[in-house]
Amino acid sequence: MAAKGNREKIKLVSTAETGHFYTTTKNKRNMPEKMEIKKFDPVVRKHVIYKEAKIK
């Protein structure tokens, strides 16, 4: 069997308080800090900052 990878599933939550989120993976070894990325929020129809949150 293959070895378990370093990538962990994360959720990117919109800072516009719309409840919209994206899911993605991230390599914990290369990026130990919390991820912040600007992406499109279709609820407000603007690009806003998305912050990392844990998937429950």
Swiss-Prot record:
Record flagged with keyword Ribosomal protein: yes
GO BP field: translation
Keyword RNA-binding: no
Record keywords, A-Z: Ribonucleoprotein, Ribosomal protein
Pfam families for the chain: Ribosomal_L33
Residue runs in coiled coils: none
Name assigned to this protein: Large ribosomal subunit protein bL33
UniProt-recorded Gene Ontology molecular function terms: structural constituent of ribosome
Gene3D superfamilies found in the cross-reference section: Ribosomal protein L33
Entry-linked PANTHER family: 54S RIBOSOMAL PROTEIN L39, MITOCHONDRIAL, LARGE RIBOSOMAL SUBUNIT PROTEIN BL33M
One annotated Gene Ontology cellular component of this protein: cytosolic large ribosomal subunit
InterPro entries in alphabetical order: Ribosomal_bL33, Ribosomal_bL33_CS, Ribosomal_bL33_sf, Ribosomal_zn-bd
